[in-house]
């Protein structure tokens, strides 16, 4: 029976991976190509094909302007093809241009002014950014903004924060002179600063204390990203020690825990933070724990023996560790909720989009300065895996993940690599300055180099994703 249940769960996740991946990528590709398409139309460029996917055509229709809208079997991208393109990669067809009549030449992309060609190319990535801003903004408007007090409620022993002199209860006021009013800002700063000294100013019992901390790369396992290394300083905000749910058949469920229970002590030690619970369980070595919970105003003593997980048992964390099978609400102890109007929501959406852009660029820069490894560069397997996991949490999370991917695709396309939009923009910038196009031989050679770079990045992403692929196949067994 357990084997059947596991097979059903794995099959359900596989379907979520496929559905989530197709949902996210199709929308992101459509938005990107629609950006190119709309600006091309505005500039009077004749668009012959708008394709979602590559390869053999599944279905298509032709609109009143003569554009063929097609869907293809390989959903790993898309393209907009202009009248004077030789192929889907927008390589100019010079022979076709020479044979065009005057009407056709008016719609030829390569014959448009350089600023119009640049606008058409830039419109794809910009559409991705705008889409993300609107999606993030819509969620801020819908749910409001939760601000978590930037308090160091829990300090991991031996961490950079502990070494720097952080004390439990320290309230972070600024980092590097930048005011901090939300714990999320601490995380964002730390994640983009591996190996760099950060100057903290904290409030401790009404006194201003200056502390210097250097984030270090720590190996982590989480449900979405799996096993990876992330810069950290070892501080967390307090999370209510309330049981949100229980793992079916887990030690806590067997011991009599119920959703809504508030853990108030473990082995005689007062508990005010879910992080404390996790730490005690993690250090238990599977030994019995005496836990007191508050339920309906009554203190109830419970005894639970943590279960050691087996390698590969948990998709979110393949490392064996003691667990009791309780889920946290994730609700901070110190937080405030702020309602957000539509204009402010768009601003917050733009801020979140900008944070993703700067964080990505910081990560790429840190790879070249040897502060980060390239292990987080992933490909379609990682995107599909994350899409499935977000879909399993809820549709709203999948939509926000789609917005995140939209930012990433937009930014990657702006990298100055020939064959990408950014490479075309570099050629147009040179043309605008010199007054003449870059020689075709140089462009063709650059495109080959660009294609080689893209293929190498894809191979690196595939290599980094082998762990995820192996995990998928292990579930089949």
Go through each PLM region and give its residues.
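Functional transmembrane alpha-helices
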Residues: 2-14, 103-115, 228-265, 269-270, ...
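Small-residue-rich helix-interface/hinge motifs
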Residues: 13-98, 412-434
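Alpha-helical transmembrane segments of integral membrane proteins
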Residues: 16, 20-24, 29, 400, ...
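Internal alpha-helical transmembrane segments
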Residues: 31, 78, 82, 96-154, ...
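Alpha-helical transmembrane signal-anchor/signal-peptide segments
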Residues: 43-48, 144-162, 167, 472-476
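Interdomain regulatory linker/hinge segments that flank or connect interaction modules
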Residues: 93-133, 175-225
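Pore domain of cation channels
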Residues: 119-130, 401-414
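PDZ/PDZ-like domain micro-motif
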Residues: 156-170, 187-189, 247-261, 279-280
